A protein has these predicted regions:
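Short linear proline/tyrosine/threonine-rich motifs used for host-factor recruitment
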Residues: 476, 483-485, 491-495, 549
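C-terminal "tail" modules appended to repeat-scaffold proteins
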Residues: 448, 545-552
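Compositionally biased low-complexity segments at domain edges in trafficked proteins
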Residues: 467, 471-474, 478
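Long, heptad-repeat alpha-helical coiled-coil segments that mediate oligomerization
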Residues: 504, 508-511, 515-518, 525, ...
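Sec-dependent, cleavable N-terminal signal peptides
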Residues: 1, 529, 552-553
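Kelch-like beta-propeller repeat domains
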Residues: 1-462
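Extended alpha-helical heptad-repeat/coiled-coil "stalk" and oligomerization rods
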Residues: 462-467, 496-497, 505, 539
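Coiled-coil heptad-register positions
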Residues: 530, 534-537, 544
């Protein structure tokens, strides 16, 4: 049984294209290949179909077909652009700061061109990027904002799709040396052979390929620009070659030539394909399919109304609800709800090991769990857009109202996939205005939610650390000793009926009132500073005047 499509109730007023899932549960979406970005926010019940659009800050440079990634601290990395106002195949890079809605230009790699280079976020949070002009690769460290050379490949990275595997290797089908494959062994900083494919996935005239992703069973799946598909089984030892088998073909000569794909929570992969076209020919329309890894079958599903163009215009985003949002460079966007047919195994779910049960708005907490970064990067396009969603989101549902809010997550302990029973952690910040009372908290990754835990959301509290001795001195008599001492419920008199009360008591009262007013004023100032700091919490603050700092409290 196939899934179903729904249009967004509030359709975009722009040319909806590349999308990324931010760690607060919102979706950022580019307007065509320009500088403008928009944000889709789900409604009060966590429904994206009924969500609303709002504008975001614009990038410094327009870019179309480029490297992109959401980082472990929640920032968004972008580099290159096959087409850009900074020049064709630009090497310009920038970083988006969601907490302050701001873009900062960051250092470019040493190459003169980045263009539509593939990239992959490594388990430690760094980003591996490939050169489109040579065999070189480089790694960007988002903490230090520096580039370092990585090992060279067997061929150029041009047009390749990269897949992060559970054994901490990055798998690539070689588009410039097809049908060979290779993989990057992260621990060894080495590219090694991943064998030879039994069937061609790369179209020779365009050296294009389709999407690829790790599957829940540990294999990797690639869809080809030739209409064929293939599956890779990793070896027991990371630097060995592994094995390939053929998958099902797309029917009727259709091809996934520069196309997105998405691993859904039911274990199936949503794919698109278009009629065959050689070289620079990319005919439409786009047709949709579900690949079932368990049955090794390709099944056609209904096409949405915005599928009239070629498949390279399409983008997919896996929503925290388990649905898939599809855009195609138009002012239409549709949501696919997969059929429950398929298997959602319990061991695919993230699991909460520990989480505070008393939460407060505007405060930060730590959640520990297993499989917080999922079994796969889940969403793929290839070289033209990095769309991975393998990071934890925290979702809270108020039991009384049913309202849903997402907490911004950051500082994930790893970005690896398929981590099994290894305990991981992430930080999350309860948003301002969070409804108080009993609630259920879930951690969500790749559209799959953990079992919920009960929490209680309390009001925001601003804490002061008071020195009791200093307070006693403040409200006491310097000549005769303290008139008051600080008790569990506030100041209490030492001798309420004796002769000490008089003018000294009145003076002490005035001092207390003055001190409280000063504390209230200080509290307002501290709260303003706290709000400013909160906007950067968990992120590396943008470089200003040569000074960089991590803001935390």
């Amino acid at each position: 049984m196939a899934g179903s499509w729904q249009p967004l109730k509030s359709q975009p007023t722009f040319s909806a294209s590349t999308m990324l899932l931010l760690t607060d549960g919102t979706i950022m979406c580019q307007d065509g290949g320009g500088t403008a970005w928009w944000k889709l926010t789900p409604d009060l019940h966590g429904d994206y179909v009924n969500g609303t659009w709002s504008p975001l800050a614009s990038m410094h440079h327009s870019r179309l077909y480029y490297a992109s990634a959401v980082l472990r601290d929640g920032r968004v990395f972008m580099a290159g652009g096959e087409y850009s106002d900074a020049g064709s195949e630009t090497n310009k890079a920038e970083m988006y700061y969601p907490t302050i809605d701001w873009w900062a230009e960051i250092p470019s790699p040493a190459w003169s061109e980045v263009g539509d280079a593939p990239c992959c976020v490594l388990p430690d949070g760094r980003i591996l990027v490939g050169s489109i002009d040579s065999t070189e690769t480089a790694i960007f460290d988002p903490v230090t904002e520096t580039w370092t050379d990585a090992a060279s490949k067997d061929d150029s990275s041009s047009e390749e799709t990269w897949v992060l595997l559970p054994d901490e290797t990055v798998l690539a089908v070689e588009c410039s040396a097809h049908p060979k494959a290779e993989k990057y062994v992260i621990a060894a900083d080495e590219w090694v052979s991943a064998g030879t494919l039994p069937i061609e996935l790369v179209q020779a005239s365009s050296i294009e390929i389709g999407p690829g992703m790790a599957l829940p069973d540990g294999r990797a799946f690639f869809a080809g620009a030739t209409g064929h598909t293939a599956l890779y089984t990793p070896p027991p030892i990371a630097n060995e070659a592994g094995t390939w088998t053929t998958g099902p073909d797309f029917p009727d000569g259709l091809e996934a030539k520069d196309a997105p794909g998405c691993l859904m929570p039911n274990g199936k992969v949503l794919l698109i394909a278009s009629p065959a076209g050689e070289g620079g020919s990319y005919p439409g329309p786009t047709h949709f399919f579900e690949f079932d890894p368990a049955a090794n079958t390709m099944t056609a599903v209904t096409d949405p109304a915005n599928a009239g163009g070629p498949c390279f215009t399409g983008r997919m985003m896996l929503l925290p609800t388990g649905q898939v949002l599809f855009t195609s460079g138009s002012s239409q966007a549709f949501v696919y709800t997969p059929s429950p047919s398929g298997v959602l195994e319990d061991d695919w779910r993230p699991e909460i090991v520990s989480c505070p049960t008393l939460l407060r708005a505007k405060q930060t907490f730590t959640l520990q769990g297993e499989q917080l970064t999922g079994l796969s990067q889940a969403v793929s396009y290839g070289d033209d857009a990095g769309l991975a969603t393998n990071y934890p989101l925290v979702r809270i549902r108020n039991i009384k109202t049913g309202h849903v809010r997402y907490c911004r997550t950051f500082n994930h302990s790893t970005m690896a996939v398929g981590t099994g029973e290894t305990t991981q952690h992430t930080s999350f910040k309860v948003p301002a205005g969070m409804e108080q009372g009993e609630a259920e908290l879930e951690v969500v990754v790749n559209g799959i939610a953990s079992e919920a835990v009960r929490v209680n959301v309390g009001p925001f509290l601003l804490h002061f650390h008071l020195d009791e001795a200093a307070v006693n001195q403040l409200i006491g008599s310097l000549a005769d000793g303290p008139l008051w001492v600080l008790g569990p419920h506030g100041p209490v008199p030492v001798d309420p009926w004796g002769p000490k009360i008089g003018k000294q008591a009145e003076a002490a009262r005035d001092q207390i009132i003055t001190a409280v007013r000063e504390l209230q004023q200080l509290g307002n100032e501290v709260e303003k500073l706290r709000e400013q700091a909160d906007r950067f919490e968990g992120e590396i603050e943008p470089s200003r005047g040569g000074i960089r700092a991590t803001v935390a409290h």
